[in-house]
């Protein structure tokens, strides 16, 4: 059965559907020697040859793909980009290496925001989770600086006008603090750029700390260090797939034995420590080079 080219490539982990549509439009993809155009359909067969930038890539039938999802604790200061020309740290630096696929970020967090960021090998899953029409909840813990009264909270719940259209928090709940430094937990069902910060700024309140603590029903895992990752289990992965009307997985690569889990936790801690040392040396070297 034929499928849209971008869907096949997204499912195989070569990018989100939007990313792949862009590279197809740029003429960077060929199918059996012919430059592909947006809207082309392909049937995945053993003889199918798809190239991106001239490089032959691997694609499999849907039934052969195993969808994997990571929960990553993004620290402040990391960029949500695959490569940075200035050599700054990115969210992809610490992720486990893959063969024949790559990690795709489910949305973005700005450089000054920390917390839960999901990654998957399934571009179609990433695309559906990000799409506003799916209305997947994102929850944030927010520390704000400024006077917050009932009128401002009412405006944030009912909606305010931003430069890219109206926006509102689905829920907003006070969670602690005193005076002009207070914490709130807020939820949104879309992921516009800096939306949480811009909503508070629209009522004259500044955000001094922002942490994403939940995506759908997937929470930021307890005990996960900043810069650490953990792979979602079978049930969690299928929960996300069901949330966006994708068929469930029937197999998983997640180890279930306790000793394997302990080994993974130790690997995560070592990777976080090693990456921090490398990043620190890189920053130190940068300062020396700049005098």
Swiss-Prot record:
Start and end residues of each S4 RNA-binding domain: 3-63
Keywords assigned by UniProt, alphabetized: Isomerase, RNA-binding, rRNA processing
InterPro entries listed in its UniProt record: PsdUridine_synth_cat_dom_sf, PsdUridine_synth_RsuA/RluA, PsdUridine_synth_RsuA/RluB/E/F, PsdUridine_synth_RsuA/RluB_CS, RsuA_PseudoU_synthase, S4_RNA-bd, S4_RNA-bd_sf
Entry keyword annotation includes Methyltransferase: no
Annotated SUPFAM superfamilies: Alpha-L RNA-binding motif, Pseudouridine synthase
Keyword Isomerase among record annotations: yes
Enzyme category, top tier: isomerase
Catalytic residues identified in the record: 110 (nucleophile)
Chain positions covered by the region annotation Disordered: 272-291
Annotated catalysed reactions: uridine(2605) in 23S rRNA = pseudouridine(2605) in 23S rRNA
Enzyme Commission code(s) on record: 5.4.99.22
Gene Ontology biological process: enzyme-directed rRNA pseudouridine synthesis
GO MF: 23S rRNA pseudouridine(2605) synthase activity; RNA binding
Pfam family, any one: PseudoU_synth_2
Family according to the record: Belongs to the pseudouridine synthase RsuA family.
PANTHER family in the cross-refs: PSEUDOURIDINE SYNTHASE FAMILY PROTEIN-RELATED (PTHR47683), RIBOSOMAL LARGE SUBUNIT PSEUDOURIDINE SYNTHASE B (PTHR47683:SF3)
Function: Responsible for synthesis of pseudouridine from uracil-2605 in 23S ribosomal RNA.
Protein name as it appears in the record: Ribosomal large subunit pseudouridine synthase B
Gene (UniProt): rluB
């Amino acid at each position: 059965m034929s499928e849209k080219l971008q869907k096949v490539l997204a499912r195989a982990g070569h990018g989100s559907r939007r990313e792949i549509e862009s590279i197809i439009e740029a003429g960077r993809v060929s199918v059996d020697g012919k430059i592909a155009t947006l809207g082309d359909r392909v049937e995945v067969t053993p003889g199918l040859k798809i190239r991106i930038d001239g490089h032959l890539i691997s694609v499999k039938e849907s039934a052969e793909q195993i969808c994997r999802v990571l929960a990553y604790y993004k620290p402040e200061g990391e960029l949500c980009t695959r490569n940075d020309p200035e050599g700054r740290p990115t969210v992809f630096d610490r992720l486990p290496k893959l063969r024949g696929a790559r990690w795709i970020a489910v949305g973005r967090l700005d450089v000054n925001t920390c917390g839960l960021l999901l990654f998957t090998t399934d571009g179609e899953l990433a695309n559906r989770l990000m799409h506003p029409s799916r209305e997947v909840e994102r929850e944030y813990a927010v520390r704000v600086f400024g006077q917050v009264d009932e009128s401002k909270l009412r405006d944030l719940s009912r909606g305010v006008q931003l430069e890219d259209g109206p926006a509102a928090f689905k829920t907003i709940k006070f969670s602690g603090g005193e005076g002009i430094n207070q914490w709130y937990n807020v939820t949104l069902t879309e992921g516009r750029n800096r939306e949480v910060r811009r909503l508070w700024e629209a009522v004259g309140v500044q955000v001094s700390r922002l942490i994403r603590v939940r995506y759908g029903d997937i929470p930021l895992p307890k005990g996960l260090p900043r810069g650490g990752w953990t792979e979602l289990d079978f049930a969690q992965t299928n929960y996300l797939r069901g949330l966006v009307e994708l068929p469930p997985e029937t197999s998983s690569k997640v180890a279930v034995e306790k000793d394997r889990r302990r080994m993974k936790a130790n690997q995560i801690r070592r990777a976080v420590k090693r990456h921090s040392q490398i990043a620190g040396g890189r920053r130190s070297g940068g300062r020396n080079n700049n005098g």
